[in-house]
């Protein structure tokens, strides 16, 4: 069956979107191709309205191993749960789609992105959002797109649209931007400390480049798009009471209740105002129909609270905890609260508190990253934990949520930019952010706590990093940017803009817009205000730890790096691994690389040093003429074996022991005796002949050892018939 294909150029390569050939029973279906990367993207919504009071949208990103010609490595040889990369890719798509569904839309909607082919150069994570935008645009699902998404890199000072995997390794930034025709909706960035102005320029560049994709999707919608189905919005008559409820709330003290500093106390006071107002409308909560009426009134009252909070911010520059728009909450920091951890710190900002813990390990602890676009070992891990007690709630605890994975990834990108290279600091690093209290910006507090824990552990980071979450309240042309937002401001505001960086520039950024998008001018103002807040936080961190501790934590393991001749690796390994097992039995882990780099890892510094000395002995290349203070380790009728250094013995012939003729070696030497010896010769098998330097010239030198086999034995006698 022949479908209809639409094409445009993006980043110098053709992007094609086809519809009408695959998955035709679904509401919206497209097949997208870019290079040899292909995706099938579908969109479907239920006909009946969901009883949920939020948008029931799910986005699934399905990686298929056949896309790169692989068979899954699982026991059943089939794909399992989505990996971290797939979850992050799904979140990128979700964040650009969600704000554009109409208000009151409550139909369960599912977008599924299936990677059919991956060329490992053109990443599917930024193609999925384009496919989702196209599938929704041509479907019968109400949605306010289209949107487009591109990645921007910067190589040699030039911006590149959708850089290949090879180009991305040389890029100063990895920026993903999604937007509509007129505005930016979502930004995700990791960078090697770039300026705020460079970021804004890159975002503007991305927005201009995505216009061709938006043109293409609009053309698709005009030619093959379906009529959108009608849905029933909230339509509750109680919503008409919002102005009346607002008057009653103001009379009941809503302003003072909202401006209460502490979260629990504020919740209690606003609840008391709400309940008093509702009681005036429903005096008997047990009456028939009262429960539904109360629920509807609560929903309407929530709008009143939102309106009042936004009014206070815009008109009076007052926030829920009494701060103005630019203020950062009070900060309290403690370094090394955990006595046995390699590095630890507590970072508290207002009612958000995170315990950061750093653990140092060896290459054996690195994690294998094996997805459709990457096969590598990651030597830096950051795990973000968000238990229910952090918000004073009771919830089921299970595996990591998508939110935890996303927040951890952002913090990881922020910190990775300042880590030393593995050659400079040969440790695998695991950071854990334990969120103990959460009232906004817990991921940014994780960045601060994590960096402090690294410095406490003695990790030589390039510079401290801090993070701050920015917010926005916008009504028409009037807006106010907020620094260090509360959870309440995140829920009721129009933007969540997280910015991380050093004093010199930005290392990571994440922006989600809940309105139709923001202009570059608002973005510049938000970045400038974020820098102001970030520098304030860095100053508070410096009061406790301004730089990494000069020495590793006493509880941290020690790693000693040794470089040997690669031809001597066999000596360290030994026959069947015998030698390396003996080394590890001394209390250390030993890793050996093909280039001759050996790393000795031990929690016991003395054990690590002993193993290093043993390896140095095993790999030392003895030379004729060198003298050693040796120890007799064995005697034989023909001479004594003398240990020169770890792993290397030489033989002192009986004729070279004394000026006098000896009938037995034991007449002059016994096991354990120490003596000065000199290397007289080394045969082709590495066997060492020794002499005593003080007797040199006084006794006749011994003839060199004859080679064992392989010499010239003369001609073979004639064969007898």
UniProtKB/Swiss-Prot annotation:
Residues 557-623 form the KH domain. Its main location: cytoplasm. Its cofactor is Mg(2+). GO terms for biological process: mRNA catabolic process; RNA processing. Keywords: Cytoplasm, Magnesium, Metal-binding, Nucleotidyltransferase, RNA-binding, Transferase. InterPro entries: ExoRNase_PH_dom1, ExoRNase_PH_dom2, ExoRNase_PH_dom2_sf, KH_dom, KH_dom_type_1, KH_dom_type_1_sf, NA-bd_OB-fold, PNPase. Belongs to the polyribonucleotide nucleotidyltransferase family. This is Polyribonucleotide nucleotidyltransferase. It comes from Deinococcus deserti (strain DSM 17065 / CIP 109153 / LMG 22923 / VCD115). The gene is pnp.
